[in-house]
Amino acid sequence: MSTDTATEAGAAPAQSTTAMTVTVKILRYNPEVSEESHWESYQVSAEPTDRVLDALHKVKWDLDGSLTFRRSCAHGVCGSDAMRINGKNRLACKTLIKDVNPSKPITVEPIKGLPVLKDLVVDMEPFFDAYRSVMPFLVTNGNAPTRERLQSQEDR
């Protein structure tokens, strides 16, 4: 019987046998409270196939609503949830709990090189300023083409 069918029949859904308690250690920063950042640890229940983003949601929704982080598509497309997880730049929505050694605290901090606004949120404007300055696209000198511009091996 599926979990949905069991729930509809009045039975409790089956409990996962792989759930574990993981410690998420987050570098917190709130300029309205202090100029210094500090580490805070939270314990959440997680499955090995949960994503770090799921753990952050549990912290925010169940333990500390003041935690601030960006997320959007949750499918690894937009890059909104880029952060340092266990010392590496990663997307929280693509990083599985089982891949970051959940037997030890999972450290989460903002990405480096950009000013931190609050907790895991950084000011992206310096990045976008640099992006606009290099114009990472082709600019034509004439009229728009009427068909696709094909590139030969010699043109590359």
Question: Can you annotate each of these PLM segments?
Answer:
Residues S2-R156:
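Signature of N-terminal electron-transfer/Fe-S-associated modules in redox systems
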